[in-house]
Amino acid sequence: VTSTKWPVKDDFIFSASMKINNYFLNDQVSFGLMVRDDMYIDKVTPDILGDYVAAAPLLLTHENAPANCFARKSGKLVYGGTCTRGYKPGETVKVQIESTSDGYACTFGDETTITGGFDFKLTALDPENVYLCMFAARNADVTFSDVRLDIK
């Protein structure tokens, strides 16, 4: 995980190209961009901490219909929608998270931009900042390029 602390009052567009090099097929593998309300690095805890939105697929075992973006709000996982197809190693996709007046808009590849269910500001744990991240979880190998953080 690579992250940047960002003032919550400053609207942004966070985007990148992401090459999917390889991944182990299970429902917890994911990769993309994330915005969180707090960041935990090298912290061991049994608690599920923090809320987030992710411009990323999930449930990759659902071959042609993985989840299109996801979020965690008040400890509950929320799926943004369903992808129109599966994503395979060797593909390069665009990913983007844009702050909006009431939350975030997440886009993964050519899929529909997700805003519904992502209408919260991520200020529960840190009311001043959010944390913008690039991530690959659970045996995923991706390469990010053309990473941009634009102020709106």
Question: Residue locations for each model-derived region?
Answer:
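Surface-exposed loop/edge segments in extracytoplasmic proteins
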Residues: 41-43, 78-81, 112-118
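Extracellular beta-strand elements of beta-rich domains used
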Residues: 144-149
